[in-house]
């Protein structure tokens, strides 16, 4: 019997996450490590679990995740979007609920580039009247 799995891709800032959803008991592994070991911060773990908690599927799936690029927050956001997309692939009736909660929307905010003649993207040198 082939393993049936659902797939979802998520991106946030410079992070990308590939999410594979399989029927199981609620094990979540990111890059071969358990979720609690991969993310040190509790907030990041909460972000990842949000779509599962909303749809009451916390212990119904085993999730395999490959996350690359960016930092902790970016990867957590990318994983959340990937899980939401994989859940919709599994059951399309979950889409309105996930969309209403904002989990189906790609956060388009990116880092603004540094401009020539400025310290940072917008930070200029202190203005001197005289």
UniProtKB/Swiss-Prot annotation:
Belongs to the universal ribosomal protein uS9 family. It holds the Pfam family Ribosomal_S9. The gene is rpsI. One of its GO terms (biological process) is translation. This is Small ribosomal subunit protein uS9. It comes from the Bacteria. GO terms for molecular function: RNA binding; structural constituent of ribosome. It comes from Xylella fastidiosa (strain M12). Keywords: Ribonucleoprotein, Ribosomal protein. InterPro entries: Ribosomal_Su5_D2-typ_SF, Ribosomal_uS9, Ribosomal_uS9_bac/plastid, Ribosomal_uS9_CS, Ribsml_uS5_D2-typ_fold_subgr. One of its GO terms (cellular component) is cytosolic small ribosomal subunit.
């Amino acid at each position: 019997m082939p393993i049936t799995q659902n797939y979802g891709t998520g991106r946030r800032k410079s992070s990308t996450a590939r999410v594979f959803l399989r029927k199981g008991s609620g094990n979540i592994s990111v890059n071969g490590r358990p979720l609690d070991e991969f993310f040190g911060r509790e907030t990041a773990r909460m972000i990842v679990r949000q779509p599962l908690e909303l749809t009451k599927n916390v212990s119904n799936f085993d999730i395999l995740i490959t996350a690359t690029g960016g930092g902790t927050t970016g990867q957590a956001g990318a994983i959340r979007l990937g899980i939401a997309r994989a859940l919709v692939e599994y059951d399309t009736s979950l889409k309105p609920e996930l969309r209403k909660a904002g989990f189906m929307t790609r956060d388009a905010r990116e880092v603004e580039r540094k401009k020539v003649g400025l310290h940072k993207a917008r930070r200029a040198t202190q203005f001197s009247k005289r």
